[in-house]
Amino acid sequence: GVPCLCDSDGPSVRGNSLSGIIWLFGCPSGWHNCRDHGPTIGWCCKK
């Protein structure tokens, strides 16, 4: 999957690890949405 920035990772992608994965059709079972705003396409989810 494509990594994405969770709210807990920090305000920007620079110098922060991307702990989320982008899912186009919502987070799968056992995962949760870890970003309140964005991404534009899909959901940023993590286990």
Swiss-Prot record:
GO BP field: regulation of signal transduction
Function: Binds specifically to voltage-gated sodium channels (Nav) (site 3), thereby delaying their inactivation during signal transduction. Thus it may strongly stimulate mammalian cardiac muscle contraction.
Highest rank taxon of the organism: Eukaryota
Disulphide-bridged cysteine pairs: 4-44, 6-34, 27-45
This protein's record includes keyword Disulfide bond: yes
Pfam family, one: Toxin_4
Record localization: Secreted; Nematocyst
Name this polypeptide is given: Delta-actitoxin-Axm1f
Keyword Secreted: yes
InterPro entries, sorted: Anenome_toxin (IPR000693), Myo_ane_neurotoxin_sf (IPR023355)
Family to which this protein belongs: Belongs to the sea anemone sodium channel inhibitory toxin family. Type I subfamily.
Entry GO MF terms: sodium channel regulator activity; toxin activity
GO cellular component terms given for this protein: extracellular region; nematocyst
Keywords, sorted A to Z: Cardiotoxin, Disulfide bond, Ion channel impairing toxin, Nematocyst, Neurotoxin, Secreted, Toxin, Voltage-gated sodium channel impairing toxin
